Amino acid sequence: MAEHETPEPESVKLFEGMSGSDSGNIPTYDVTIRVRRYNPEVSDKAYWDDFNLTMYRTDRVLDALHKIKWELDGSVSFRRSCAHGICGSDAMRINGRNRLACKTLLKDLDITKPIIVEPIKGLPCEKDLIVDMEPFFQAYREIMPYFINDSNE
């Protein structure tokens, strides 16, 4: 299991001119994200990779994954789109529960232990956190969960 660390960011100043020593600062904390990695071009076996990050209190799991991809390991693969909990493209298992990475705040998880991030179950894994959604969409098309208008109006 590989470990990666990011440099510690300075706290962010929200409002200039506020009184108090920490007024307007967003506190930071250290967190370990444990990502289930899988690359069929390299091996048919999955493995775990730990990433040690310093994150802000307002960050979500998606922010941590972005930080990992952009600053530590560009090969980490995951889906994301709207980042507002609408599209569902960043669905994954976070600490054993199916969740949206864009809606899950890190501060709501137990950060004293590694946060486990893995692909959702029940669909074939293509790479890292990306699953093949075609079986889901095929079942969706078969049940036709929408209205069909037979009239010309």
List each model region and its residues:
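Signature of N-terminal electron-transfer/Fe-S-associated modules in redox systems
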Residues: 2-153
